[in-house]
Every structure is written in structure tokens, then in C-alpha cells.
Amino acid sequence: VEWTDGERTAILTLWKKINVEEIGAQAMGRLLIVYPWTHRHFASFGNLSTPSAIMSNDKVAKHGATVMGGLDKAIKNMDDIKNAYRDLSVMHSEKLHVDPDNFRLLSECITLCVAAKFGPKEFNADVHEAWYKFLMAVTSALARQYH
């Protein structure tokens, strides 16, 4: 992926403002509520039977924070995201057997939560476009092992 200076600045500026615990918990909760078939990957998380159970589940929040924290690896390796995520791609493909489309679904949930948090002044069209491109690069890197 090639980044313009504007895209790189938009992504890095936004990333500095993101609270990974807050956005991670919200995004993971949304994923599990909106796409209930994803529950099968999180059987060890306990009660995922209702939206309120999901949103108050500490394991959901912790995993969401872990996922968001993992984006820091992509931030620090924006020019080589695929290689930075090689091991995670192998793990999700060969050990966890995660449907690679779930990465895209989670990216959408993350984007919704970020947009809701920062609003249209900070998360304007240009920032949204750069952020989307960034998350699609991460999604592609995570799905790499499946190809």
C-alpha cells in the first residue's frame, strides 16, 4: 500500500486520539451483537445471549482492547503491514479458523465506533477515507494466509 502524506497524517493523528480500551470494547460488542454467528469463535467468553450481556462482558472488552492495541503494529509498520501481520494471519487461518470476512466486519464496527466518538468535524470525509484504506490494508494482511 502506498500512502500519501495526507493519508499518513490523517491516520496517525486519529490514532493518537483513540482510546483502544473504549473503542475496542464497543467495536467487539457491536460485532457480536450485529453478527451473532461470530459467537462461535468466542465460546470461552461466557454469556453472549443478549446485547446487554455482551456489552457488559469483561472478556469481550478485553479482547476488543487487544484487537485495537494490535492495530498499533500496523501503525508502526504502515509501509509493510502484510509482513507485520504474517504471524497473526497464520494463527487466525490455521489455528483459529476464522472466516476472513470477519476481519472486514470488525473493521466496519471499528469505523462506526470511531465515527460516533469523534463526529464529522474530526472524522471528516478525508479522514474516513484514509482510515478505511488503513483498515482494509490490515484486513488484507490478516486474510493473506487464506489465499
From Swiss-Prot:
Keyword Transcription regulation: no
Domain of life according to the entry: Eukaryota
Gene Ontology CC annotation, any one: blood microparticle
GO biological process: hydrogen peroxide catabolic process
One Pfam family named in its UniProt record: Globin
InterPro entries: Globin, Globin-like_sf, Globin/Proto, Hemoglobin_b, Hemoglobin_oxygen_transport
A GO term, aspect molecular function: oxygen binding
Keyword GTP-binding set for record: no
Signal peptide: none
Tissue expression remark: Red blood cells.
PROSITE patterns named among the record's database cross-references: GLOBIN
Residue positions binding heme b: H63, H92
Record's keyword terms, sorted: Heme, Iron, Metal-binding, Oxygen transport, Transport
Domain Globin intervals: 2-147
Function of the molecule: Involved in oxygen transport from gills to the various peripheral tissues.
Listed PANTHER family: HEMOGLOBIN FAMILY MEMBER, HEMOGLOBIN SUBUNIT BETA-1-RELATED
Similarity remark: Belongs to the globin family.
Note: This fish has two hemoglobins: cathodic and anodic. Cathodic Hb has high oxygen affinity, low cooperativity and displays a small reverse Bohr effect. Anodic Hb has low oxygen affinity and cooperativity and displays a normal Bohr effect.
Subunit structure and binding partners: Heterotetramer of two alpha chains and two beta chains.
Protein name as catalogued: Hemoglobin anodic subunit beta
Species assigned in the record: Gymnothorax unicolor (Brown moray)
